[in-house]
């Protein structure tokens, strides 16, 4: 596959994630957009690793590290959101002022 096509795809995914993160008012949607951003970064790591030196696995190892961080975020994020929902009865970002109490 051509490098430019993959980079355009990654930039498109990253832009969608940033747009969704900025405009979302729901915490669940913000977490999903954050996952989209992390996946765009993974695509870049693997693409540049394959394009510049396919014998070394630096980009692939970084990608596995980012996937592990995303898995931890996917496990801890909903637990925090359910706790916030239990206490505040809402998952809206603009309604939750957690530093108030």
Swiss-Prot record:
Its EC number is 7.1.1.-. One of its GO terms (biological process) is ATP synthesis coupled electron transport. It comes from the Eukaryota. Signal peptide: none annotated. It holds the Pfam family Oxidored_q2. The chain crosses the membrane at residues 2-22, 32-52, 61-81. Disulfide bonds: none annotated. NDH shuttles electrons from NAD(P)H:plastoquinone, via FMN and iron-sulfur (Fe-S) centers, to quinones in the photosynthetic chain and possibly in a chloroplast respiratory chain. The immediate electron acceptor for the enzyme in this species is believed to be plastoquinone. Couples the redox reaction to proton translocation, and thus conserves the redox energy in a proton gradient. NDH is composed of at least 16 different subunits, 5 of which are encoded in the nucleus. This is NAD(P)H-quinone oxidoreductase subunit 4L, chloroplastic. It comes from Platanus occidentalis (Sycamore).
